[in-house]
Structure formats: structure tokens, C-alpha cells
Amino acid sequence: NPASCCSCADVDPGRASRKTPKGEDQVFIKEKDRC
């Protein structure tokens, strides 16, 4: 599932910002081929 990728990304058009359990902002790459 591309949406659940856990690879961190720098500013990227395909990124998705999420909150970690600690409340920190974490960025994930959506494209599966970039995980």
C-alpha cells in the first residue's frame, strides 16, 4: 500500500505528512517504487 510507505522524504510532490505517535511531523513518500 503506497499510502503506508514509511520512507522519509524531503520536500516532494508525492509526500504525505503524518503525525507520529509522539506528535511529531513525519513525511512519507507515497509512491511505492520510491520506498
From Swiss-Prot:
Disulfide bonds: none annotated. Residues 1-35 are annotated as: Disordered. Residues 21-35 have a biased composition (Basic and acidic residues). It is found in: Secreted. One of its GO terms (cellular component) is extracellular region. Expressed by the venom duct. Contains disulfide bonds. Keywords: Cleavage on pair of basic residues, Disulfide bond, Neurotoxin, Secreted, Toxin. One of its GO terms (molecular function) is toxin activity. The keyword S-adenosyl-L-methionine does not apply. It comes from the Eukaryota. This is Conotoxin TxMEKL-0422. It comes from Conus textile (Cloth-of-gold cone).
